């Protein structure tokens, strides 16, 4: 997969280390046995990080905040948060330098105190330079929920300009988009977006200094379908062809009225 991502011209990759079903792709070090080392005898997260480092790609970790498998999530929320922080501590300590943590699921229990201060402080103590992202979901796109967060998210939605005048630090933004309708691998989901749509979304993201996070779901053996690899490689070819426009200059606020999908760049 690493070679495919290189051809796709990726700057970073986000791996789902644990999703809402509670299964971990990393060694949970005794927290539970519901993880990859206990089922297939492999630490998938370590393999992922090693591959990223080999190919010069920054590894980021998606990690669920909600957990359908862990009983304490429903019965003792404070105890669950201790379990969650121990899980994150394992990822912070055992896999070298991590580019970022991409959290998701707080929207499932919005009225609870998620003790974000404790979680983010833990991460900073082990990984001071890592980015911390917490997906605000479709209903709250572009909102910054905590001062320690480094990016806002636009899940399946067009990014908007961010007012940084009152911010003590630079806040990034990112649009995450699926290729078909599902986030994970779905064998019978053929509702693929066109390459034109994906390229247009990518261009719009860069207009607003936003990153484009393109999701494809690997099969059970870790491989990608031919159509997934093809889409990634075409996006990579297009981004390499337009590298200067996408990654070097800064976008301006000037709009081309008769060509709404075009934008003007300035150097320096």
What are these regions (language model features)?
Residues 1-268:
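Mature catalytic domains of secreted/periplasmic carbohydrate-active enzymes
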């Amino acid at each position: 997969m690493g070679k495919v991502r290189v051809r796709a011209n990726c700057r970073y990759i986000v791996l789902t280390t644990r999703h809402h079903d509670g299964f971990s792709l990393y060694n949970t070090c005794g927290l539970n046995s519901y993880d990859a080392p206990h089922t297939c005898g492999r630490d998938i997260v370590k393999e992922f990080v090693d591959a990223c480092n080999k190919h010069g790609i920054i590894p980021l970790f998606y990690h669920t905040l909600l957990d359908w498998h862990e009983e304490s999530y429903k019965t003792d929320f404070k105890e669950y948060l201790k379990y969650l922080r121990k899980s994150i501590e394992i990822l912070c300590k055992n896999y070298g330098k991590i580019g970022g943590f991409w959290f998701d699921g707080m929207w499932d229990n919005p009225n609870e105190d998620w003790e974000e201060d404790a979680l983010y402080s833990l991460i900073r103590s082990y990984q001071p330079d890592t980015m911390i992202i917490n997906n605000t979901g479709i209903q709250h796109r572009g909102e910054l929920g905590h001062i320690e967060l480094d990016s806002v998210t636009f899940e399946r939605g067009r990014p908007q300009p961010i007012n940084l005048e009152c911010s003590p630090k630079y806040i990034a933004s990112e649009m995450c988009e699926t290729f078909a309708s599902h986030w994970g691998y779905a064998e019978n989901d053929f509702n693929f977006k066109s390459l034109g749509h994906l390229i247009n979304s990518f261009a719009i993201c860069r207009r607003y200094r936003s990153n484009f996070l393109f999701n494809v779901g690997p099969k059970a053996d870790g491989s990608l379908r031919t159509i997934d690899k093809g889409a990634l490689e075409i996006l990579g070819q297009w981004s390499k062809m337009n590298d200067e426009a996408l990654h070097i200059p800064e976008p301006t606020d000037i709009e081309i009225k008769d060509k709404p999908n075009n934008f003007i760049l300035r150097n320096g």
